Structure formats: C-alpha cells, structure tokens
C-alpha cells in the first residue's frame, strides 16, 4: 500500500514537472518568436532608414556635382556605355553617399539596441511606435522631394509617348511637316521629305563647346559679370552670325532631352531630343537611333568626308555609335591619339586630353581632310567640364574664380584656332559653327 502511494506521488510529480516543462517551452517559444519579430522589424526599418539616408545624400551629392539635372539624364547615363568616365566621380559617390549612408544605418541599429537596454518596456514601446511613424513619414517626404527635384513621374509620362523615329528605319509620314510625338512644342521636319541639293557647298567645322553659356559675359553683352570673361568670343559673335534668345548675346534655351553632352550632340545632330530608350537600344542591339536622318547622313549622301575629334573616349555614352552609324568615316579619341602621339602628363586630365593640345592636333587633321575634297570636321572640347573644370598651362590667372579663368582660356584658344583657320586656303569655302553643348552644371552658375 505504501508503495502504491509512493508510486502515485511520483506519477503526480511527473505530471507537474511535464506541465512546467511545457509551460517553460511555450514561454521560450514566445520569447523566441518575439525576438524574431523584433529582428525582422529592426531589419525592415534599417533598410528603410538606409534608403532614406541614401536618397538624401544622393540628392545633395548630385546637386553639388551636377546641378539641376533630371531623372532621364541620370538613367540614360547609368544605362549607356560608361567607358572613359572620370573615376574620381564614381569614387566620390561611393565614399560620400553609399559608405556614409551605410555607416549611419549601422549607427541607427546600435542606437535602437542601446535604447532597448536603457529604457523601460513601456517607454521603449512608445519610442518604437513614434520612431516607426517618423521613419515612414520621412521616407514619403524624401520620395516626394526626389520626384519633384528630378521629374520622375513626368519622365514616365514622357516615355509613354511613342514615335518610330528612334528605332525604325522608315518614313513615318509623307507630309511636309511631321509632328514629333513626345512634346507638343516640337514640330519635327523629317529630312526624308525634303529635297536637299547643291553643287557649290561649303566645308563644315562644327565645334561643341563644353558647358558654354552666356553667364560669363558682362552685363552689357547679356551675361551677369562685371568684367567680360569671354572678350574674344564676344567679338566673334558680334562680327558674325549669332543666334540668341534675347536682344543681347545669348543662345538656345535647353529643353527635355538636350541638357547633357550626348543629348546635346544628338539633338543638334538629328533635330530630336534624346530618350532613354536609345540607351536600351545600344545595350540590346548596338544601335543608336537608326530611324533618324542626321546631318552626318545628309553630308555623307553628298560626298563629304567626315571626322569627329574628341579628347575623351569615343565609347562613352555611345558617342561612337551616334556618329559612325550616321555617316561619319572616322573618330579620333584619346585612345587612337595615344597610338599616334605621345603626351606629357600635364597635357592630360581625368577625362582625357586638354583642349589646347586637342586644337593643335585638330589643325593636322583638318589639313589632311582638306586634301580629300569636301569635309565635315566636328570636335568637342572638355576643359569646362563640371565640377571645377580643368586648368591648362595656358590658362590665365586674371580672375579670383578658377572656373572663370578656364572660360577665359577657352575664349583665347578658340579665337586662336579661328585665326589659324582664316589663314588657310579652304577658309573662304568653309562654315564654322561654335555652339555650347549645354549649360554648365557647376552649381554656383
């Protein structure tokens, strides 16, 4: 009987122990699930914080380095070939934006863990709710600000408007005036519908001037400076034909799809703004606006020998495809020039060749071209490129601002080159076009 009583007590104790173990196990599971839930929430909000900080830092970095650019410009640059890009710009973004955003996000995690240990459960729960709300609100505000700053929604609306001119080699209409679908302010005259002829035609020298605008003129001539930084170019403009948006010296007003180098080249070359789908075509099918008829195509049909000369790499942003697929016979870029010439370190910059050296070599190329018959020599400068431009050994130290000295140097270089052209036998039968590719991206201007 005693044994049965003892056995019953043992069974009872075992049941109690089993119940306690189950309760303990359930409690541990709840704690584990709670910890897992908190970890997931912490991870989610850390990612949101990272995106938030990344957006903020990116906005600041882009504004400081490129000024008021738009979303399509950023997207086109990311999608198009980047060979020849100034690596200092890439490293600057990695360090100042990505790394800084990552470090601040890690500090956020440590801050949350510190508050969790120091605050009571009730206080921490309140802080967690308020913090989560604040994070979501700031993310929404960041997204709204980014859209307002870069016209992201407008870009997608713009992209939804289609035209075959970018990607099909065919006539779209046979009307005299063909409207380009994509911007109601643009009336596109299809060159396929126009008879272009002429026997006594001129040679063409077409020079894209990096980041040139009338800001650097004095107020008397249409700029904002007390002293004219471009006296030589001012005289050239006054003595020859110039086009302006005002009664003073000015120029074309840029619009969507024309405000960075390859976009400006494309719009001047084709009469059309650049769209991001062109970058997709380059990436997928290795082609650049096969549906457009360009200046290069027209001159090629009329027997011109055509050459492009640039101090950077021709592959950048698809420059080689734009010109070689539309009538040009040759491109001289930094790589091909290095094979033919040797350069000193003070003749090079982060993008390639200094402009003074480029103008020297341009004289050799034009002299050879002039012996072949009618020619189109196109070139692009680089020294005024953002954010600070590139000083060369000929740049004056006239102004306190480095950028103004570079523009003054450009004015002298271009004027000297024009003087050389005037001394050549082919000058009287040559049209020279000087045009800024886009407004400067340097923030102070």
Provide a role label for each language-model segment.
Residues 1-3, 11-12, 18-166:
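Transmembrane and membrane-interface helices of multi-pass
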Residues 85, 141-211, 219:
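Membrane-interface segments at or immediately adjacent to transmembrane helices
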Residues 87, 95-131, 168-186, 231-246, ...:
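Solvent-exposed, charged interface segments at domain starts and junctions
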Residues 2, 19, 31, 35-38, ...:
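Serine/threonine-rich low-complexity intrinsically disordered regions
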Residues 185-445:
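Solvent-exposed soluble domains appended to multi-pass membrane proteins
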């Amino acid at each position: 009987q005693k044994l049965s009583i003892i056995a019953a007590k043992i069974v009872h104790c075992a049941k109690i122990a089993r119940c306690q173990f189950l309760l303990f196990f359930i409690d541990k599971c709840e704690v584990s699930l709670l910890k897992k839930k908190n970890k997931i929430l912490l991870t989610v909000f850390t990612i949101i914080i990272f995106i938030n900080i990344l957006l903020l830092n990116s906005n600041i970095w882009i504004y400081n380095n490129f000024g008021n650019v738009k979303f399509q410009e950023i997207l086109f640059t990311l999608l198009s070939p980047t060979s020849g890009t100034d690596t200092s710009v890439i490293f600057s973004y990695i360090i100042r934006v990505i790394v800084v955003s990552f470090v601040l996000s890690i500090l956020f995690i440590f801050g949350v863990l510190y508050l969790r240990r120091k605050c009571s459960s009730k206080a921490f729960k309140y802080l967690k709710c308020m913090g989560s709300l604040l994070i979501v609100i700031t993310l929404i505000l960041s997204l709204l600000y980014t859209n307002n700053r870069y016209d992201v929604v407008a870009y997608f609306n713009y992209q939804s408007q289609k035209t075959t001119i970018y990607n099909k080699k065919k006539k779209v209409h046979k009307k005299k005036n063909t409207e380009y679908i994509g911007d109601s302010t643009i009336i596109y005259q299809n060159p396929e519908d126009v008879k272009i002829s002429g026997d006594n035609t001129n040679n063409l020298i077409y020079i894209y001037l990096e980041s040139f605008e009338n800001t650097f003129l004095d107020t008397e001539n249409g700029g904002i400076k007390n002293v004219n930084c471009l006296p030589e170019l001012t005289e050239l403009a006054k003595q020859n034909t110039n086009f302006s948006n005002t009664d003073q010296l000015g120029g074309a007003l840029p619009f969507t799809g024309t405000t960075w180098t390859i976009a400006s080249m494309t719009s001047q070359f084709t009469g059309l703004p650049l769209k991001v789908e062109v970058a997709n075509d380059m990436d997928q099918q290795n082609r650049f606006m096969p549906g457009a008829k360009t200046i290069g195509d027209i001159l090629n049909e009329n027997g011109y020998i055509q050459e492009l000369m640039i101090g950077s790499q021709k592959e950048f942003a698809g420059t080689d495809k734009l010109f070689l697929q539309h009538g040009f016979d040759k491109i001289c870029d930094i790589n091909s020039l290095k094979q033919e010439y040797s350069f000193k370190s003070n003749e090079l910059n982060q993008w390639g060749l200094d402009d003074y050296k480029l103008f020297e070599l341009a004289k050799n190329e034009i002299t050879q071209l002039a012996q072949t018959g009618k020619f189109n020599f196109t070139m692009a400068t680089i020294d005024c490129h953002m954010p600070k431009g590139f000083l060369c050994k000929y740049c004056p130290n006239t102004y306190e601002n480095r950028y103004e000295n570079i523009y003054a140097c450009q004015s002298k270089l271009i004027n000297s080159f024009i003087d050389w052209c005037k001394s050549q036998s082919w000058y009287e039968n040559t049209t020279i076009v000087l045009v800024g590719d886009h407004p400067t991206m340097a923030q102070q201007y």
